[in-house]
Amino acid sequence: MFSPNFVLASASPARLKLLQTIGINPIVRPSHFDESKIVSDNPRELVEILAKSKAQTIAPDFPESLILGCDSLLVVRGEIYGKPNSPEEAIARWETMQGHHGTLYTGHTLIDTKQHKTLVRCGITEVYFASLDRPTIEAYVNSGEPLKCAGCFALEGKGGLFVDKIEGCHSNVIGLSLPLLRQILQELGYQIAQFWDSRSTPKNEY
């Protein structure tokens, strides 16, 4: 059975680690797409467009390949949060987030350049944040972790300490829904096992 190259259009270490955890060692090619070009008040629409744009940007360079693009956003109390632009912004966001619940949207696009097919899906997970005092918020932001993450937290890192519970897909919060990836691959006619250990180490193309 033909197994195309699997390409990750992202520089996210968390997404790469998720793929490696399930036995996929992709070619890594960050798209460097300018996300500021896309504006929408609809978070689901926004992450789907951004994920698709990232994958489409690099697709011409990879014939007979599968290109995976993803994008995540957190919505808390009606506000859409991507990555914070500064420590001060991260602190302000956490003061809003703490003690409340948010909705984490992750857009997924898989482009099959051999079959000339593109599938776009969105994973949605509810996240419930712990109540935190100001010193704890400042200490977490000063660790640097929130500045690298959509929504100002990393569930797989220190941020997991401050999440009381989630409803939905755990890996979706980290940046890539593994069950959703399996479903998309099946829709394209592939089985996830085709891509296990297809490469011994990821090939970074920065």
From Swiss-Prot:
SUPFAM superfamilies: ITPase-like. It is found in: Cytoplasm. The active site is at residue 71. GO terms for molecular function: nucleoside triphosphate diphosphatase activity. Its EC number is 3.6.1.9. Keywords: Cytoplasm, Hydrolase, Nucleotide metabolism. Its main location: cytoplasm. InterPro entries: ITPase-like_fam, Maf-like. It catalyses: a ribonucleoside 5'-triphosphate + H2O = a ribonucleoside 5'-phosphate + diphosphate + H(+); a 2'-deoxyribonucleoside 5'-triphosphate + H2O = a 2'-deoxyribonucleoside 5'-phosphate + diphosphate + H(+). GO terms for biological process: nucleotide metabolic process. CDD domains: Maf. Its cofactor is a divalent metal cation. One of its GO terms (cellular component) is cytoplasm. Nucleoside triphosphate pyrophosphatase. May have a dual role in cell division arrest and in preventing the incorporation of modified nucleotides into cellular nucleic acids. Belongs to the Maf family. This is Nucleoside triphosphate pyrophosphatase. It comes from Rippkaea orientalis (strain PCC 8801 / RF-1).
